[in-house]
């Protein structure tokens, strides 16, 4: 099924419909670039490259004030295909406009009428030539979908097959814009016929690993009332600015989001001290974060060891309590 939704005109254009369901799923040969379901561990996040400033834009154009006062979702959101069917959810391949870039990704949708809470999942930096759509974050997205969450997972700009915009020092503003555009499309389409028919806009969480954690923090700073809870996993939280330094990179003064921080103590990509310092800063702001540190674990937890299952267990419990609003008692 190939569907384009234009948010400007509110028109639904069905370009073509191809029914290719055999035993409830699309053959693997018909999928876009994809790993086997036993190999979604994929590449691990790597350090963000050092970039030379190439933009002629003034820093104010990357400010939170500008991001808060501009518009989003002024383009097309394409449901490219039903990508795969599982026992508890379906995965759709989607493409959407984000300013001058075309962003690819997928959406996991549980079966049933819902309403279902929503998680936006943001991957870390991986060498673009190594990045694939179903990478290491897929296992987390799938576990959340099986637990009854709609999961939106964009391939941010510069990560194939999404468009590669000019790289510049913009404090992750371009990536943040990609997320804010996705959020605008979700809001427009929620409750209407389509993959977001069962989405509950009152229950949204966000999850970010590595640079994805920094992007989540920027997004929360722009949308302080939107997210019920956030998971920051090995997050880049001190490199571009802090929540206390007044730099304008982050602003948590109005953020009411519940925050859970996770970091491996042997992380040689993003030092664990970044998350320890973030925990101290958030406590100074009376944000009462959860903070977990995992002995012997690297930047991306070893899938076959104790830490990754424990991290996922804590993730589900945290989102269930603060996004689903399920009491621990």
Q: Where do the PLM segments sit?
A:
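Alpha/beta-hydrolase fold nucleophile elbow
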Residues: 195-209
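C-terminal catalytic histidine-bearing segment of alpha/beta-hydrolase fold enzymes
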Residues: 276, 285-329
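Short substrate-entry loop that stabilizes the transition state in hydrolases
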Residues: 114-116, 121-164, 239-240
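Mobile cap/lid helix-loop segments that gate and shape the active-site cleft of serine hydrolases
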Residues: 130-132, 219-257, 284
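Alpha/beta-hydrolase active-site loop
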Residues: 170-193
């Amino acid at each position: 099924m190939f569907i384009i939704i234009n948010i400007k005109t509110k028109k639904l254009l069905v370009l073509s419909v191809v029914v290719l369901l055999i035993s409830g799923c699309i053959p693997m040969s018909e999928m876009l670039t994809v790993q086997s379901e036993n190999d979604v561990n994929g590449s691990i996040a790597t350090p963000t490259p050092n970039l030379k400033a190439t933009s002629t834009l003034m820093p104010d154009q990357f400010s939170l004030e500008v991001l808060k006062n501009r518009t989003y979702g002024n383009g097309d959101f394409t449901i490219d295909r039903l990508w795969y069917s599982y026992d508890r959810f379906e995965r759709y391949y989607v493409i959407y406009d984000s300013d001058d870039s075309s962003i690819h990704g997928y959406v996991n949708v549980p079966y049933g009428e819902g309403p279902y809470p929503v998680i936006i999942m943001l991957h870390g930096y991986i060498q673009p030539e190594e990045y694939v759509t179903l990478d290491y974050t897929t296992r987390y997205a799938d576990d959340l979908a099986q637990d009854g969450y709609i999961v939106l997972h964009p391939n941010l700009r510069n990560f194939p097959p999404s468009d590669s915009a000019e790289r510049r020092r913009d404090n992750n503003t371009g990536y943040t814009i990609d997320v804010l555009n996705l959020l605008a499309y979700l809001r427009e389409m929620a409750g209407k016929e389509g993959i977001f028919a069962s989405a509950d806009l009152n229950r949204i969480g966000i999850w970010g690993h590595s640079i994805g954690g920094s992007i989540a923090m920027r997004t929360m700073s722009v949308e302080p009332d939107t997210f019920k809870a956030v998971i920051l996993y090995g997050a880049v939280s001190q490199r571009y600015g802090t929540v206390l330094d007044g730099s304008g990179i982050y602003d948590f003064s109005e953020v009411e989001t519940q925050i859970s921080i996770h970091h491996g103590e042997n992380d040689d990509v993003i030092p664990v001290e970044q998350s320890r310092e973030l925990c101290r800063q958030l406590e100074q702001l009376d944000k009462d974060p959860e903070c977990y540190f995992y002995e012997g674990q690297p930047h991306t937890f070893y899938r076959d060891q104790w830490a990754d299952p424990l991290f996922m267990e804590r993730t589900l419990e945290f989102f269930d309590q603060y996004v689903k609003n399920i009491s621990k008692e």
